């Protein structure tokens, strides 16, 4: 019987879920349980001497039946008529039995039901789930979409066990409403508890999980300590699993995805192996919500069956003879804005840099660009020791439209400006770059960076946007990365008309829902060729898709290719049918740091390489679907 549930406590989970429904469900379950009890008592009474089971209930107040004195069954002459004392004793015993049945038993049953319901609703109930489950630690706003992603794969888990500090009813409601297949509700188990507590962690039985996701809580619960607590949770989890696995040499390594809210923290853990002692038990996989969205927007998933509303950064593939450059303008150096810039810097590399010296340009526009630039350059100090960049304070420029010098630089190969000079750390005479004079050449970095201080409503910045969108040799993309939804929409729809017409696409961040931008697009659709149709929403919490299996598979193939011998060819191995994913996976799990490089940095190098393949293939003239 228990094979279906795996453990008796799982049966309690099913009972709790049933009893926590509406009144009719509770009534039906109590009626069912009481009926079973009465049927059992009736059968016992029949076995004890009643000629029909129903008489056990009809004569419940007849002391003779309770004492087995029914003259129809027993010999009344031999036994005699019951005395008054016997009748009184029989009546007392019958009444006590009735009180026990109708009072104590019923009250106990109702109290038990109420307690089970309360424990279920509050998330205090715990169930012994040890097989075929995924553990999610934290109830961050992405938990609903993560559940949908896990339940839409081919091999879906039997259970998804969630531990978090938010109200469990609220979490359940969010998840249930977002589930594409409502039949999957029965797979969701929610516990309430602090993720920093080892007791709560152990209640998940994490050593038995298929996968573990540490996503943490929202800002109201975690504040600025989100990343710190998530890392502490990982170490607690790692030490516990190490204790449980001390004598198990055949234990399979568990993937443990750890979310970092801040780009700086996430970037740091992409380059370090933080848990070498237990890396054979837990596969530490850091990820960032905002970078995940940036990949979703900038890196098309060619294997996905869903329609993609996001365009690549170019209009037509850029080959070695093209004069065009890609220009990504990011309004707002928010978490999303920084993630978009980093992802673009990973993928926007084109062959016309080698042949024509054309560089991709990434521009930040922010009210506090000077301060944010300092943080950004400090975070990627090595990059800015070899990359050209400049800072422009649009607030200090005289406004007056085209009567003053515009600071947009249309020369992608050798940007020159009389007033707003570019810093070139590889060639400037006064440069203090460590790499100057290292004979790296001018063709080492093909991306330039701009930091423009000012509001998007500033006339000088609007002139800059017009110039950028009007440049025939520039494919201009705008990303409005303002976290406040109405502000982002307002900034997008009030762009100059020339910008709306001349831009390749205008991405508008929407934190919760795309209703505003979708309504604008729907209204604009009625007017053929309306420029507001170029507005595309992104960043919505209910559309985040943390499904990196296809990208990871490509990264593993790239890593496998690096390990091939001089006489081996991946294309021949693939075409001959000799390529086995087991070997590819083995080369990934057994990868070791090369020449002092951490394993984690090598993995991320392969993953970013995989993300850039779409653009490289496009530059070769290979069309999508070929």
Language model features: what each stretch is:
Residues 32-43:
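Canonical alpha-helical transmembrane segments of integral membrane proteins
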């Amino acid at each position: 019987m228990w094979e279906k549930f795996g453990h008796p406590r799982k049966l309690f989970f099913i009972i709790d879920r049933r009893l926590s429904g509406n009144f009719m469900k509770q009534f039906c379950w109590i009626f069912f349980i009481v009926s079973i009890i009465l049927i059992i008592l009736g059968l016992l009474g029949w076995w004890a001497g009643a000629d029909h089971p129903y008489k056990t209930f009809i004569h419940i107040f007849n002391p003779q039946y309770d004492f087995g004195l029914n003259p129809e069954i027993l010999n009344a002459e031999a036994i005699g008529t019951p005395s008054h004392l016997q009748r009184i004793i029989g009546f007392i015993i019958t009444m006590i039995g009735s009180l026990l049945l109708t009072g104590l038993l019923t009250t106990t049953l109702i109290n038990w039901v109420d307690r089970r319901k309360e424990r279920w609703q509050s998330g205090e109930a715990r169930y012994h789930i040890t097989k075929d489950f995924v553990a999610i630690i934290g109830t961050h706003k992405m938990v609903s979409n993560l559940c949908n992603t896990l339940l839409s794969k081919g091999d879906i888990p039997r259970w998804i066990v969630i531990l978090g500090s938010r109200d469990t009813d609220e979490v359940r409601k969010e998840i249930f409403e977002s589930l594409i297949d409502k039949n999957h509700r029965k797979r969701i188990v929610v516990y309430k508890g602090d993720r920093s507590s080892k007791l709560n962690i152990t209640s998940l039985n994490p050593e038995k999980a298929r996968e573990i996701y540490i996503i943490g809580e929202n800002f109201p619960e975690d504040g600025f300590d989100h990343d710190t607590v998530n890392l502490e949770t990982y170490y607690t989890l790692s030490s516990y699993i190490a204790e449980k696995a001390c004598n198990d040499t055949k234990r399979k390594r568990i993937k443990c995805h750890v979310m970092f809210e801040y780009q700086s923290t996430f970037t740091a853990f992409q380059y370090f192996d933080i848990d070498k002692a237990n890396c054979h038990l837990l596969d530490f996989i850091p990820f960032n919500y905002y970078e995940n969205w940036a990949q979703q927007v900038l890196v098309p998933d060619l294997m996905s069956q869903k329609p993609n509303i996001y365009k690549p950064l170019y209009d037509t593939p850029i080959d070695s003879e093209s004069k065009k450059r890609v220009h990504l303008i990011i309004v707002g150096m928010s978490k999303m804005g920084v993630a978009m810039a980093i992802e673009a810097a990973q993928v926007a590399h084109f062959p016309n840099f080698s042949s024509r010296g054309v560089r991709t340009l990434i521009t930040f526009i922010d009210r506090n660009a000077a301060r944010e630039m300092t943080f950004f350059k400090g975070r990627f100090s090595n990059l800015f020791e070899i990359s050209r960049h400049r800072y422009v304070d649009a607030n200090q420029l005289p406004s007056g439209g085209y009567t003053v010098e515009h600071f947009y630089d249309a020369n992608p190969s050798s940007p020159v400006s009389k007033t707003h000079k570019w810093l070139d750390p590889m060639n400037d005479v006064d440069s203090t770059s460590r790499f100057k004079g290292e004979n790296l050449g001018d063709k080492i970095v093909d991306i330039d960076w701009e930091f423009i201080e000012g509001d998007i409503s500033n006339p000088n910045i609007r002139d800059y946007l017009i110039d950028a969108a009007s440049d025939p040799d520039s494919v201009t993309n705008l990303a409005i990365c303002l976290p406040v939804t109405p502000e982002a929409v307002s900034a997008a729809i009030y762009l100059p008309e020339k910008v709306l017409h001349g831009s390749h696409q205008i991405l508008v961040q929407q934190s919760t829902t795309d209703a505003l931008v979708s309504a604008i697009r729907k209204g604009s659709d009625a007017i053929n060729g309306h420029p507001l149709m170029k507005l595309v929403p992104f960043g919505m919490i209910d559309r985040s898709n943390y499904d990196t299996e296809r990208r990871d598979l490509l990264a593993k193939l790239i890593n496998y290719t690096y390990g091939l011998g001089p006489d081996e060819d991946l294309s021949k191995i693939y075409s001959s049918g000799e390529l086995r994913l087991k070997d590819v996976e083995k080369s990934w799990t057994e990868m070791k740091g090369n020449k002092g490089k951490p394993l984690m940095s090598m993995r991320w190098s392969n993953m970013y390489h995989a993300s850039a393949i779409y653009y490289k293939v496009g530059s070769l003239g290979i069309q999508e679907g070929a």
